Design a protein with these regions (language model features):
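N-terminal cap/lid segment of alpha/beta-hydrolase-fold proteins
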Residues: 70-89
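Catalytic nucleophile-loop/oxyanion-hole region of alpha/beta-hydrolase
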Residues: 104-107, 133-159, 163
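Conserved alpha/beta-hydrolase
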Residues: 114-137
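Alpha/beta-hydrolase fold nucleophile elbow
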Residues: 163-173
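Short beta-strand/loop motif that positions the catalytic acidic residue
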Residues: 278-280
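Acidic catalytic loop of the alpha/beta-hydrolase fold
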Residues: 283-287
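Short alpha-helix in the alpha/beta-hydrolase fold that links the catalytic acid
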Residues: 288-297
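Catalytic active-site module of serine/aspartate enzymes centered on a nucleophile-bearing elbow/loop
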Residues: 311-353
Length: 353
């Protein structure tokens, strides 16, 4: 049975969807607190430096305490792959968010965002993608463009089963934004809305072009050189590269799989109909803001909003102005969590009579 939110079109104001793209001017923020001067740049993968790993799992060696926690928090995905899930949900939470992380990173990098959600009464489910963090699977690799959505579905089903009365949202960043957006295309109406951050839905920047065109095996790997482009705060990039759970290489096969997904979403944009807040850094050098603009223009949702933050890099939830960005996301989630449920199937039957 479908899950859908009843939206008061008068109170919400359908002008959100009707506003032309030029109405979404970059959001200006105080530059005085910036860690360093921000300049736009183009990030290009150097595909001449690659190596082959026939099979590898994400393999930081956990200690005994971590092993116990991992065993307790593992769920089986559609093909039996074990995914690590970090559940933080109070009995009286007013809504639940599934947080989906980006390429090469892990769910633990979203501690601050999750903490802010908990303060607002939201429960969270965070998981490591297959081949990432504490999850099992071939390292940083997908064999098909929809594997990420199938993994998300396992976590969503668990969240629904454990919180049947709570509104449910998906918050996805970068590759996690790709996965969240793809999930919305494949499962319209299953969750109550989406927040997308720097979502890699189109690849207008050409981040994966070299990998797609390279004459290399899918299980060939290139170095992860994303650290300098994730945030204008150098300490965030340094912590990213020093983090033992951030994987320092990525497969050509993953880029090829997601490239197919980008094309599929372009061709099937009308399938996305759910409420969505699309956020992007205006100086994102990894994923072009144009990706989010095109997604906004092409999807069929009438309840959709786009915000592009001038001067912010890729990881807007970690940027110098992160609290303002998170506040925007929480305001949107709070509004949509307060809307009443309707039953999609029953409404359709009544409409046919």
């Amino acid at each position: 049975m479908g899950r859908k939110r009843a939206l008061d079109r008068v109170a919400m104001g359908c002008c959100v969807a009707a506003m032309p793209p030029e109405a979404f001017l970059p959001v200006q923020h105080d530059k005085s607190v910036r860690a360093k001067k921000t300049t736009s740049f183009l990030f290009i993968l150097h595909i001449d430096n690659f190596f082959i790993i026939p099979y590898a799992e994400s393999s930081r060696v956990p200690n005994e305490t971590e092993e116990r926690k991992m065993a307790e928090n593992m769920v089986l995905s559609f093909d039996g792959t074990k995914l690590f899930v970090n559940k933080e949900v109070d009995m009286d939470c007013r809504a639940v968010c599934v947080i989906v992380h980006g390429l090469c990173e892990h769910q633990g990098r979203y501690d601050y965002l999750a903490e802010k959600m908990h303060e607002m009464g939201f429960g969270t489910y965070r998981f490591d993608h297959r081949g990432h963090g504490r999850s099992k699977g071939t390292k940083v690799f997908y064999s098909a463009f929809d594997e990420i959505a199938k993994d998300i579905d396992v976590v969503v089903d668990r969240a629904i089963a454990e919180n049947p009365e709570a509104p449910l949202f998906i918050v996805g960043h970068s590759m996690g934004g790709y996965g969240a957006a793809l999930y919305g295309h494949l499962h319209p109406g299953k969750v109550d809305g989406y927040v997308l951050s720097g979502a890699w839905t189109r690849d207008n920047k050409g981040l994966g072009t070299g990998a797609v065109e390279a004459d290399t095996p899918d299980l060939a790997y290139m170095p992860n050189e994303l650290g300098d482009g994730v945030c204008s705060d150098p300490s965030v990039g340094e912590a990213y590269m020093a983090d033992p759970y951030v994987i320092k290489e990525m497969s050509f096969g993953l880029f090829r799989a997601l490239h197919k997904g980008h094309a599929w979403m372009r061709e099937n944009a009308s399938r996305f109909v759910d409420p969505v807040l699309i956020l992007h850094g205006g100086d994102d050098g990894l994923v072009a803001p144009k990706d989010s603009l095109e997604l906004y223009e092409q999807i069929a949702s009438w309840d959709k909003s786009l915000r592009i933050y001038a001067g912010l890099y890729h990881e807007i939830f970690n940027e110098y102005d992160k609290d303002a960005v998170i506040e925007d996301a929480l305001d949107w989630l709070n509004l949509h969590a307060d809307l009443e449920f309707i039953d999609v199937e029953e409404e359709e039957v009544e409409g046919d009579e």
